[in-house]
């Protein structure tokens, strides 16, 4: 698996992401500066990590979405390449037009930093094949604007097409208002593009890949990607 991790001013999770990718794949990720106009040759996974790109000015991800490197990412995605956006990366993908909807202020207007539970809605995608369908995993969140919103038709289309891959839930897998940490429409924590090759999610799976962290539930996402790409090679 040859990964490229994008780096924007204000991003602060790129090293965490690169470490997770190496732990699972055994390969170093290329760190790609936002001013680059091309991705490294042979890249088969692009990751847009979390943080506060450009200080979250204008809107979260709005400035980063217009960086030169994002033209290369859009082309990469159009050609079928796998793209993963986490937290601020999810916001950037939405602002870039690679995913529908927008991430708004959390419903209670407070920054949330804690572990949450997610239900894996399906496991027949590159981003979920490391889990079982319906499996509940625990991963951290750290965001102030993670409230996913889209118009009613878009949400219905996402649901109908099976494009909601991760959903906030209880430890037992129950979905409801009391388990929806940020007010996201339909308890959405992660969605995939129409072609299924671009995933955006607010939680941070890269922070739960090592035993020392007390939980390795995030490892399945990266292991599934590595398995998928190994088969495709």
Swiss-Prot record:
NCBIfam families, sorted: FGAM_synth_I (TIGR01737), PRK03619.1 (NF002957)
Pathway terms, separated by semicolons: Purine metabolism; IMP biosynthesis via de novo pathway; 5-amino-1-(5-phospho-D-ribosyl)imidazole from N(2)-formyl-N(1)-(5-phospho-D-ribosyl)glycinamide: step 1/2
PANTHER family: PHOSPHORIBOSYLFORMYLGLYCINAMIDINE SYNTHASE SUBUNIT PURQ (PTHR47552:SF1)
EC number(s) given by UniProt: 6.3.5.3, 3.5.1.2
HAMAP family (UniProt xref): PurQ
GO CC annotation: cytoplasm
Organism: Rhodopseudomonas palustris (strain ATCC BAA-98 / CGA009)
Gene behind the chain: purQ
Keywords: ATP-binding, Cytoplasm, Glutamine amidotransferase, Hydrolase, Ligase, Nucleotide-binding, Purine biosynthesis
Catalytic activity: N(2)-formyl-N(1)-(5-phospho-beta-D-ribosyl)glycinamide + L-glutamine + ATP + H2O = 2-formamido-N(1)-(5-O-phospho-beta-D-ribosyl)acetamidine + L-glutamate + ADP + phosphate + H(+); L-glutamine + H2O = L-glutamate + NH4(+)
GO biological process, one term: 'de novo' IMP biosynthetic process
Protein's recorded name: Phosphoribosylformylglycinamidine synthase subunit PurQ
GO molecular function: ATP binding; glutaminase activity; phosphoribosylformylglycinamidine synthase activity
Presence of the UniProt keyword Iron in the record: no
Signal peptide: none
